[in-house]
Structure formats: C-alpha cells, structure tokens
Curated annotation (Swiss-Prot):
Protein location: Cytoplasm
Keyword Nuclease: no
Species this chain originates from: Pseudomonas aeruginosa (strain ATCC 15692 / DSM 22644 / CIP 104116 / JCM 14847 / LMG 12228 / 1C / PRS 101 / PAO1)
Disulfide bonds: none
Catalysed reactions listed for this entry: [protein]-peptidylproline (omega=180) = [protein]-peptidylproline (omega=0)
Domain PPIase FKBP-type: 161-246
Record keywords: Cell cycle, Cell division, Chaperone, Cytoplasm, Isomerase, Rotamase
The protein's name: Trigger factor
EC code: 5.2.1.8
Gene3D superfamilies: 3.10.50.40, Trigger factor ribosome-binding domain (3.30.70.1050), Trigger factor, C-terminal domain (1.10.3120.10)
Gene name, Swiss-Prot/TrEMBL: tig
Any one GO molecular-function label of the UniProt entry: protein folding chaperone
Enzyme class: isomerase
Length: 436
C-alpha cells in the first residue's frame, strides 16, 4: 500500500492512498465465493452455480462493495502508519477505479492539533473566602417567607407590594394594539413588570376605580413596533390585596421537607444548604477563572469538524430547552459558533492537561461528590446507591471530578489570591465569559 500525505493547512491533510490490484481482486473473489454459497438461481442447485454465472450476475456489485470497504479499511491503516489523528470523517475522492488496476484515492480530512499546555505560571486566580453568618440565615429566611407570600383582599388604597387584580386597555393614537389589553391580570406594585409609570400610576387606587395612564414605551422596548411610542392605558382596579408573610412555624417548615425540628432545626437546615451553595459557588468561580486562564495562555486552532459537531449538539439542547415546533437544523449555526468553539478548545486543553499530568479520576472524590449531591435529598442513601448502580451517571461524575483535578493541578502553579467577601457577593453569579 502506497501512502503520501500533504499538509494543505495547519490542520487539514490531503492523503493519497494506493491499494494494490491483487488485494482488490482477493476481496472481490472472497465476496463472490460467499455469494455462490447462498445464491438461488433457477436451473442450478444451491451452492452449485458455476463461478462464471456468479461473476456475470454479481461481480459489479461485489466490486463496488469491496472498493467501499477497502477504502474505509485502508484509510485507517494509512492514518495509523502515518501517525495521524483524524478529527471527523474524511472526504474521499477516487482517482483510479478501473478493474485490474491499483485503486488510488485521495482522502481529505482534519487532524487534532498537537500542542503542549503551557503558561500555567502566568494564570492569576482570585479565590473568594466567605462564611454564612446568622444575619445571612436571617436574610434567607426572609427570602423564603417572601417566596411563599399570600395575598389577602383589603378595602383600602393600593400601595407598593400590594397585589392588584386589574383590567386594562392600551391604545396608541386612539387604536388598541396587539398585546396591549388584558382582563383579570394580577400585578404586584413595585415589581417592575410593566413599563415605567404604569405601576406607579396605580398607587393610591381603590377597588372599582378607573385610572387613565399616559405613558411612553422605552426606546429599548423588546417590541420594536412599540418602542418610544406614546400610549394611553385605561385601567380598572378590580381588587387590592396586601401581602401576608407566613409565620415561621411547623406548617411553614414542612413546605421544605423539614418536620418536627422547630425553628432551630429549620435554621440549621437552611444554613447547611447555604453553606453547600457557597462551596459550589466559590468552586465554580475558581474553575471559570482557571479555564479562562488556560484559554488565554494556549490559543490553539481547532478542527472545523469538531466545532460543527458541537454546534449541532447546542442546537439540539436549545430545542429541548425552549421547545417549539422547530427542528435543530433550522436554527442558524452562527448563533452557536462562538460558544461551540470555546467548548471545543477548552475540551482539548483539559484533555491535554490530563494527558500531560497522567491524571485519573480520584474514586474517593467521586464518592464525596455523590454524597454531597445526595445530601440535598430526603433519602440520600438511595441517591448514592442509584449513582453507583448506573455506570453512565457515575462516569459523568468521574468526568466532573477529573475536571476538578485539572483545576487543582493548575492552581498548584498559578498565582492565587484569597479575597474575603460577604456571602451575598460570593454566591452572586459571575459574568458570562467571552467566547474564545
């Protein structure tokens, strides 16, 4: 077998492969012999059909199948021989396909980049330090109570935080517009759900009162047809209800699966959950900085085929997340290309760190992670057992642990600065990283 390789770009290879005619004929004859054993042709007993008849009827198809299989077989033989690592399937162009002659074809494909991860010493990481204080727990209890607020109808003028039941009709230049009218809408004053001036204009209104609000849609309003336009809203207040926060009692605690432990027990459970959230938030922010540092220190070119595959995965995820009667391939590829490229680059860099440092998932950390996740459930032992009985899910956890070990490896060489912050700042979501 003759093989030659040409580099047409940093990652693209053009490989010419020559397969000897003898190998082709051997493969064709093997297929014809297999066909002869099972062929049913009128006038001949099974297995007794002359080879000349078999050739006449089946040689063309046998040769086509043999050629296809040989191209696939010899392609992988050739890339192993040439020590190439293809990324994606090749584009194959036959050059010589004649009977009795050597088969020659050209395979064009991309290869994985060859690189060594460097620059770990230049990566700078700010690691947040925080604790959950009693005041933080108090604030969280207030949040939980507000999330379970009930509203009771009152006979008084509306004020901020009240919930109003309203009917309204919106008009522009005297004409009602699409989406500008509704009946029985529940609106909490001060929530910011409506355009500026709408909620403020209902403060002081009573049930049965009608108010006319002359407002202007903001310039950056999501509906461009309405942006910066003046509108008149006629609003009828059907009822006014004031918020009632639930008491911190056993009935309230039971909403969160905590029973018969009293306020101290509930506070302890809330604090435990907050501490778990805090650990995860700090770990996530450190990981994001490490990954961003690896990206900046290791600018690599990646195969277009891998980016395309990742774009397709992101399309499928988008359809699953947002639903709708749309097929993944109907979503424009450019919506996902930057994110896809970032994922592919990071995946290759992380894999190279694992390879360079000979990392393997620490099974002790795998169990710790599973137990940490299981602690959020009412029956953690069952959750732990489920993970260890389901290999695919267990392997997902191993992958996460391996990424954590990559982060630890980088932190050993990076410049790490600890910063003391409040709980609120520590758990605040980080800004999304820019695409690579």
């Amino acid at each position: 077998m003759q093989v030659s390789v040409e580099s047409t770009s940093a990652l693209e290879r053009r490989m010419t492969v020559g397969v000897p005619a003898e190998r082709i004929e051997t493969e064709v004859n093997k297929r014809l012999q297999q066909t002869a054993r099972r062929a049913k042709i009128p006038g001949f007993r099974p297995g007794k059909v002359p080879m000349s008849v078999i050739r006449q009827r089946y040689e063309a198809s046998a040769r086509q199948e043999a050629m296809g299989d040989l191209i696939q077989e010899t392609f992988y033989e050739a890339v192993v021989e040439q020590k190439l690592n293809p990324a994606g399937s090749p584009s194959v162009e036959p050059k010589s396909f004649e009977k009795g002659k050597d088969l020659e074809y050209i395979a064009t494909f991309e290869v994985f980049p060859e690189f060594t991860v460097s620059g770990l010493e230049d990566i700078k990481v700010e690691r947040l330090q925080a604790e959950v204080s009693d005041a933080d727990v108090d604030n969280m209890l207030d949040v939980l109570r507000k999330q379970n607020t009930r509203f009771e109808v009152v006979e008084r003028a509306a004020q901020n935080d009240d919930q109003l039941n309203i009917d309204f009709v919106g008009k522009i230049d005297g004409e009602a517009f699409a989406g500008g009218s509704a009946k029985g809408t529940l609106l909490v004053l001060g929530s910011g759900r409506m355009i500026a001036g709408f909620e403020e204009g209902l403060v002081g209104a009573k049930a049965g009162e009608e108010r006319v609000l002359n407002l202007t849609f903001p310039e950056d309003y999501q509906n461009l047809d309405l942006a910066n336009k003046a509108a008149e809203f006629t609003v009828t207040v059907n009822s006014v209800a004031e918020p009632k926060l639930p008491e911190l009692n056993e009935e309230f605690f039971a909403l969160f699966g905590v029973k018969e432990t009293g306020l101290d027990g509930f506070r302890a459970e809330v604090q435990k959950n907050m501490e778990r959230e805090l650990r995860q938030a700090i770990k996530s922010k450190v990981k994001n900085q490490v990954m961003e540092g690896l990206l900046q220190a290791n600018p690599i070119e990646v195969p277009k085929a891998l980016i395309g595959n990742e774009v397709n995965r992101l399309r499928v995820q988008a359809v699953q997340q947002f639903g709708g009667n749309i097929k993944p391939d109907q979503l424009p590829a450019e919506l996902f290309e930057e994110q896809a490229k970032r994922r592919v680059v990071l995946g290759l860099i992380v894999a190279e760190v694992v390879k360079q440092h000979e990392l393997k998932a620490d099974e002790g950390r795998v169990r710790e992670m599973i137990e940490e996740m299981a602690s959020a459930y009412q029956e953690p032992e069952q959750v732990v057992a489920w993970y260890f009985k389901n290999e695919p899910q267990l392997n997902e956890v191993r992958s996460v642990v391996l990424e954590e070990q990559v982060v630890d490896t980088v932190l050993q060489k990076a410049t790490v600065t600890d910063k003391q912050v409040s709980y609120e700042e520590a758990v605040k979501p980080a800004e999304a990283p820019q695409a690579a």
